[in-house]
């Protein structure tokens, strides 16, 4: 009986030590931050909001491409709260060779995170269209 309790306790401890999947993603692009963010924004509009993607039905997007901080971004916000906190941020910033594109926000911890990352990775690489 004691061995069973010990095994159960060990299983609980090991499960607690498991790291959660990351709630962000980061990609590199040879393009300038404004160019890569513009390309991403065009594809976000066409693929996520121009089609039948039900995961984005409750949201709208707000491209902020004219950035004084040189960090243009695309925000995914709830339709009901367009000025509320974004649920997804796609931000481009200058890097040593081109741009770094970061994705973060609550949607990156949700069921669409992998599909979001795959789409943005393609667009950062210069591809167009929906996956």
Per-segment meaning from a language model:
Residues 1-17:
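Sec-dependent bacterial lipoprotein signal peptides
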Residues 18-131:
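Ser/Thr-rich, low-complexity intrinsically disordered terminal regions
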């Amino acid at each position: 009986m004691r061995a069973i309790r010990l095994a159960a306790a060990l299983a609980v401890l090991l499960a607690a030590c498991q790291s959660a999947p990351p709630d962000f993603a980061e990609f590199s692009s040879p393009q300038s931050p404004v160019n890569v963010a513009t390309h991403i924004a065009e594809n976000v509009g066409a693929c996520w909001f121009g089609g039948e993607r039900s995961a984005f039905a409750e949201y709208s997007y707000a491209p902020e491409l004219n950035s004084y901080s040189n960090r243009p971004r695309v925000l995914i916000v709830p339709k009901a709260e367009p000025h509320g906190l974004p649920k997804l941020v796609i931000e481009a910033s200058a890097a040593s060779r081109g741009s770094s594109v970061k994705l973060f926000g609550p949607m990156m911890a949700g069921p669409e995170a992998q599909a979001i990352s795959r789409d943005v990775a393609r667009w950062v690489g210069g591809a167009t269209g929906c996956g």
